[in-house]
Regions:
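Face-selective signature of the C-terminal outer-membrane beta-barrel domain
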Residues: 1-91, 168-170
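Outer-membrane beta-barrel signature, preferentially recognizing the C-terminal barrel domain
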Residues: 91-108, 112-114, 118-170
Length: 170
C-alpha cells in the first residue's frame, strides 16, 4: 500500500505501421505512421491523457560513389486540450502539427574513404509528468509548470571516415 500520496497508474496504447519499397534505380522509400495514447491517474500530477500521432517518409538514393538521404516527419501531440503548434525556423505556422526534416549525404572519393554531412531537426513535446508534477520532499518542492513549451533543436555534422587495409584485414 502506498501511503505517501504518490501513487500512479497509467494505460499506454501504441501502434505503428511501416512500409518500404526498393526501386531498380537504387532508390528506397520508407514511409509509415504511428500513434500512441496514454491515460494517467496520479496523485503526483493529477489525471491527464496524451495523444501522439505521426506520419513520416524518407528517401535513400545511391549514385555510384554518392548516397543521399532526405526525410520528413509530421508530429501531432496533445495533452488534455493543449496540442502541438507547428513552427518552422522560428516562424509560427497555422497548423496543429510539427514538421521535422532531416538530410544526409555521403561521398566515397577513394576506396576506404568516406566524406559525410548531415542536418536534422529535433522536436520534443513535454511529458505529462514534466508539466504537472507537484511534490515535496523535506525542504525541496517541485511545482507544476502547465505552460511548459515544446523543445526545438537542430544538429549538423561534417565528417571523414578513413578505413585501412593491411593484407587481408580491413
Amino acid at each position: 500500500k502506498n501511503n505517501t500520496n504518490q501513487g500512479a497508474s497509467s494505460d499506454y496504447y501504441f501502434s505503428e505501421y511501416q512500409f518500404q519499397k526498393r526501386f531498380d534505380n537504387k532508390l528506397t522509400l520508407t514511409s509509415g505512421a504511428m500513434s500512441s495514447y496514454t491515460l494517467v491517474k496520479s496523485q503526483l500530477y493529477g489525471d491527464h491523457n496524451s495523444t501522439n500521432i505521426a506520419g513520416y517518409i524518407q528517401g535513400d538514393k545511391k549514385w555510384n560513389k554518392f548516397n543521399i538521404t532526405a526525410g520528413m516527419r509530421m508530429e501531432y501531440f496533445k495533452i488534455d486540450s493543449v496540442q502541438s503548434k507547428g513552427k518552422l525556423f522560428n516562424t509560427d505556422l497555422n497548423i496543429p502539427f510539427q514538421p521535422v526534416f532531416r538530410f544526409g549525404a555521403t561521398y566515397q572519393p577513394m576506396e576506404y574513404t568516406f566524406l559525410r554531412a548531415s542536418y536534422g531537426q529535433g522536436y520534443r513535446f513535454p511529458s505529462i509528468a514534466e508539466k504537472y508534477i507537484s511534490s515535496a520532499v523535506g525542504p525541496l518542492n517541485v511545482f507544476p509548470n502547465p505552460n511548459l513549451e515544446p523543445e526545438y533543436g537542430w544538429s549538423a555534422e561534417l565528417g571523414l571516415k578513413q578505413g585501412f587495409k593491411i593484407k587481408n584485414f580491413k
